[in-house]
Curated annotation (Swiss-Prot):
This is UDP-N-acetylenolpyruvoylglucosamine reductase. It comes from Chloroflexus aggregans (strain MD-66 / DSM 9485). It catalyses: UDP-N-acetyl-alpha-D-muramate + NADP(+) = UDP-N-acetyl-3-O-(1-carboxyvinyl)-alpha-D-glucosamine + NADPH + H(+). Keywords: Cell cycle, Cell division, Cell shape, Cell wall biogenesis/degradation, Cytoplasm, FAD, Flavoprotein, NADP, Oxidoreductase, Peptidoglycan synthesis. It is found in: Cytoplasm. The gene is murB.
Length: 297
């Protein structure tokens, strides 16, 4: 496997370096392609060597098991963007590796509304498109026009938002392709409209303050579970008496029960134990089976 590639492959790369939980064993190979061509070359290389390939974002919604992953984990890092203005509206084309929150702030300062709800949202554009990220009254599905995808590791296509199967924190992009190679989001196109920059920046500031107030300190992946219909996962976990429960250095936050925080040297196994404890206890006490929002590999 020493053939020359236009992209750096890092063997036995600890995934704890690439997840916001700061846990995770080694990927057999890790790479960060920055262009569609690099992504296609990497996918072809993985298929040639019969190595499973997983595309990830910035690791802000990801738990990698302690044993790591026998294959290739790749994070697409392209960050080009272009704004096409049409009077009082605009279309933003932006690559998947671009930070979501930074994009929201940049547009708000320019007087373009549509993504200000994403202030403080961890991760990048691609992850938001895959998971239909949303908060504070907005979500990806409501402003996305279409997504540029890489299918089967070689076919570039553009799918309109109506074909992405969006639901609460769900899309068909979470499912593997027919040949086992998962789809990769290369870019998205978003619908924006003009607004007063001062009003938008005030909204950004209010959301930032609210996030700071509610978000526990420490390394975490944000909300661990999806909210069940008509209820809150955090409320259920708190009502089950699990706030502050600790396994090793992993803790169900005493501030927000839908957060599990790494207090130092937590292992993925510690976090998984707390996840299973929360699911089992809530199911036993309230008859609700919590569904994961984070991705586990």
């Amino acid at each position: 496997m020493k053939e020359s590639l236009p992209i750096t492959l890092r063997p036995n790369e600890p995934m704890s370096r690439h997840t916001s939980w700061r846990v995770g064993g080694p990927a057999q190979y890790y790479a960060e392609p920055t262009t569609p061509d690099e992504a296609m070359v990497l996918a072809a290389w993985a298929m040639t060597h019969r190595l499973p390939l997983i595309w990830v974002g910035r690791g802000t919604n990801l738990l990698v098991r302690d044993e790591g992953f026998a294959g290739v984990i790749a994070s697409y890092r392209g960050q080009r963007w272009a704004l096409h203005e049409h009077g009082e509206t605009a279309e933003l084309w932006v690559e998947a590796g671009t930070p979501m929150a930074g994009t929201a702030r940049r547009l708000a300062a320019m007087g373009w509304a549509g993504l200000e709800w994403a202030e403080g949202l961890p991760g990048a554009i691609g992850g938001a498109i895959v998971g239909n990220a949303g908060c504070y009254g907005g979500d990806t599905a409501s402003v996305l026009i279409d997504a540029e995808l890489l299918l089967n590791g070689s076919e570039r296509v553009v799918w309109p938002v109506t074909e992405l199967g969006y639901a609460y924190r769900e899309s068909i992009l979470k499912r593997p392709g027919a040949d086992g190679v998962p789809p990769l989001v290369l870019a998205g196109r978003f619908r924006l409209h003009r607004a007063d920059p001062k009003v938008l920046m005030a909204r950004i500031g209010a959301i930032a303050a609210e996030r700071k107030r509610k978000t526990p300190a420490g390394s975490s992946c944000g909300s661990v579970f999806k909210n069940p219909p008509g209820d809150s996962a955090g409320r259920l976990i708190e009502a089950a008496g699990l706030k502050g429960t600790r396994v090793g250095d992993a803790e169900i936050s005493p501030i927000h029960a839908n957060y599990i925080v790494n207090r130092g040297q937590a292992r993925a196994a510690d976090i998984l134990t707390l996840i299973e404890l929360a699911r089992t206890t809530v199911a036993e006490q309230f008859g609700v089976m919590l569904q994961l929002e984070v991705r586990v590999i």
